[in-house]
């Protein structure tokens, strides 16, 4: 043994001690914690991080020097309650105003609005001397406050992805229920074009959340800076994604903003919360893959979703909500109840199994029954049309990428993504008179839309679906009354399901077609109809379709989630494009007018509505809609014949009934029926066979299981018929 080896051996002996020894080496907790923190960050960190910071600091100093030279003038800040506060331009901020009101208010704020524009709380006011500036202060309870809070949380995630994974981040917006960030992650980020893609998985979440925790603890300020296109291209030279966005979104000679928090500097219009310390609870939820800008011809990216709150109690409540939503997931229930399935041989196209088809047909029958009462005529139209039709309608120029197209005999055809052009052809097929209007035409035709495979999700995002689609051709004078009729229709259908709903009137957007006078008149009619209706509605300014104003209807489910299903749209352009006309009431027999076209759907997509209803009812279908209404269970082999007789009577009366003739125990049969959510289980034995009766177990009255009195078959048929016809949701026989 060499001298050096002997020395090493001796050192090892000194370190070898028994567990019971008081001299045992104790772990250094501080060192371990430091080591753990260091392992969260790449070493060395990506070079672009320091390059960005150096450039940002230099440009920010130039900007601050410029602001320092700006003249200070007095401003009048008008709060929402009418109170007026004094301020100084380029010095006073919305946060200063909030602190002057109360510290508790300032501490809970997310963002402000200055003259209707979202504005960073720490950004000074700008304006002319003595100018009145309207100020709104928004906290997390407001929709806009939530969006800003989650947008800022996305930046925290972006910083984590850069520092922990070396990712090239792309887009990181807020969503209706949280936020996400898209990114490219490779095995080697030095040559992103050559390195293989690295998948982000939930195994990466602890590390990402660890960095996020540090970012939040450091209370990193969100700093805004306006940069020229030239400087932006220099700052983001390392990222082909950011470079593309700058080149395509920022005009030559133009400028836009970036925001910094800690080591992250990102292309962003903002605004943001004051600092990351406002985030008290942060959690990553799921991951998926996507394409850059949603285009399948672009690079495949990784997407990580998260949620955050300004209060840990809100996070606890949200996670509880997610657990409940998971139990109600229509994909889970659809599999358990054998309602539908999907197969890779036809992505995004639902295979409706027998029990799911029962639900589907019941929904369609509900609409058909109402159509007869409300003066609608049902039609059937082709599934594919020559591209010339789509050129006439305008869809070829604006919607072609969302269509499935193909060649037939050297002509280009497309599967229809909507029914309206076909209905226009029907209207134009012969001369029409004012006496025929309003003409209400309904269509359950199959529609195809070319959704990206990564966006497909159960019944809520599909490629093939059917709508309860209808179009009303009417005169301008009939618009208001037709809208009122649709409101009544909505109220009835949603009342059957037990949905609460609200409406939004979306008015003329910046880019529109047609005359302003026509728009104003149409919006006035819609607003008048909404006021007469008297329900919950608000104006969504500037969000109308380019061809006409619209009303969007949102329904609230059992989990208080809002879904947009129904829509009412006024269309002045398709009648023009198809040159639709009707003989007017004018005495001049050669006088013709253009009809107005109202696009209308109540369920929307039948597929999506089925998903919403599945989760709303948690698979416990109301009797009239249930695919499994009654299960007949004999207590023994001797009573199987009678059980089959009862089942046949139920079937002949139009009910969905089954009989369990398996060799399982009575308890097992009942349990199986309960798992499949049969509304009623009829137990039959000696007494029931002799009395021609059944013993009823109600799915929704668990405390009475096994204690129910027997009811004659004739009486129960009558009670079931009433329950079905009344479309009640209480599942109670009377």
Swiss-Prot record:
It catalyses: tRNA(Thr) + L-threonine + ATP = L-threonyl-tRNA(Thr) + AMP + diphosphate + H(+). One of its GO terms (cellular component) is cytoplasm. GO terms for molecular function: ATP binding; sequence-specific mRNA binding; threonine-tRNA ligase activity. It is found in: Cytoplasm. The keyword NADP does not apply. Its EC number is 6.1.1.3. Residues 69-135 form the TGS domain. It comes from the Eukaryota. SUPFAM superfamilies: Class II aaRS ABD-related, Class II aaRS and biotin synthetases, TGS-like, ThrRS/AlaRS common domain. Residues 11-30 have a biased composition (Basic and acidic residues). Belongs to the class-II aminoacyl-tRNA synthetase family. This is Threonine--tRNA ligase, cytoplasmic. It comes from Saccharomyces cerevisiae (strain ATCC 204508 / S288c). The lineage of its organism: Eukaryota, Fungi, Dikarya, Ascomycota, Saccharomycotina.
